[in-house]
């Protein structure tokens, strides 16, 4: 009987010890918050879930500002952006700052004064839509929840449109639009504010080539372009065909325009040509609209 009681007491003690250990593990697990993100992309004209993986540099706030994440890639897993290796938040009162760039395979570096930098970016046909995010002074979440991080484009979207202000019997068809002296390379850094340093390479952009018969309503000429933000005064060449409605068609009329352009980070510029029946543009050459 004593032996049986001894075994029972030993079992109870073992069970209590296991329960205590399990409770300790649960409490420790609850305290350990894995760094994860809820990532979205937002611009003045479009927003939605981020689609490309991104990489993050994460610093603890404080005197030392220890680097916790260093060019760590994050990808979506069941709607939450996680890294392949788990990284934990610090104590409950800890704060962090995150600096991110997308897509994750873009060559980038980080420094505390300039943030994330991408050098030698080339806005070629295959160039990605470069996005970035800066999130400072973020506290450790109270629950096992992802940290919201919002990306914006490092580029500027540009759209060209045209409308006719000619009389109804006049037909005007736009066939080509080009821009000269557009910088296509540059270096981008996110701190202290997002800024581009333009490279020496400049080129002529063919904005549109085709046939668009103008109406009194503005129509898009080609697709929206993503360009490196810059201030420039390009030569704009607008080519069109003119039908007077009296059996005479004049083809390939070229009109050159010089206008100051200002393309800013994360913005969209819309330019509208107003073409008249005077074989040229009206005095209101281009309407620039920023969104």
Label each PLM-derived region with a short phrase.
Residues 2-6, 20-291:
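Sec-type signal peptide cleavage vicinity
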Residues 8-17:
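Bacterial N-terminal signal peptides
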């Amino acid at each position: 009987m004593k032996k049986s009681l001894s075994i029972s007491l030993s079992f109870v003690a073992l069970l209590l010890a296991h329960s205590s250990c399990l409770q300790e593990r649960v409490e420790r697990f609850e305290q350990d918050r894995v760094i994860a993100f809820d990532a979205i992309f937002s611009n003045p004209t479009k927003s939605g879930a981020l689609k490309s993986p991104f990489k993050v540099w994460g610093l603890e706030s404080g005197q030392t500002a220890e680097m916790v994440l260093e060019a760590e890639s994050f990808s979506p897993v069941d709607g939450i952006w996680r890294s392949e290796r788990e990284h934990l938040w610090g104590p409950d009162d800890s704060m962090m700052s995150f600096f991110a760039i997308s897509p994750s395979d873009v060559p980038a570096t980080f420094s505390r004064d300039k943030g994330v930098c991408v050098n030698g970016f080339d806005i070629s046909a295959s160039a990605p839509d470069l996005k970035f995010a800066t999130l400072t002074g973020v506290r450790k979440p109270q629950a096992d929840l992802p940290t919201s991080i919002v990306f914006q484009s490092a580029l500027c979207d540009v759209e060209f449109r045209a409308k006719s202000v000619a009389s109804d019997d006049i037909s005007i068809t736009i066939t080509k639009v080009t821009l000269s002296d557009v910088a296509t390379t540059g270096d981008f850094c996110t701190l202290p504010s997002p800024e581009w340093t333009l490279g020496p390479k400049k080129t002529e952009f063919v904005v549109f080539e085709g046939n668009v018969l103008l109406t009194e309503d503005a129509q898009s000429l080609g697709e929206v372009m993503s360009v490196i933000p810059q201030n420039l005064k390009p030569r704009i060449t607008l080519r069109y065909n003119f039908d007077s409605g009296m059996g005479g068609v004049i083809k390939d009329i070229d009109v050159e325009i010089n206008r100051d352009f200002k393309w800013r980070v994360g913005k969209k510029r819309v330019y509208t040509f107003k073409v008249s029946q005077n074989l040229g543009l009206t005095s209101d050459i281009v309407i620039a609209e920023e969104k």
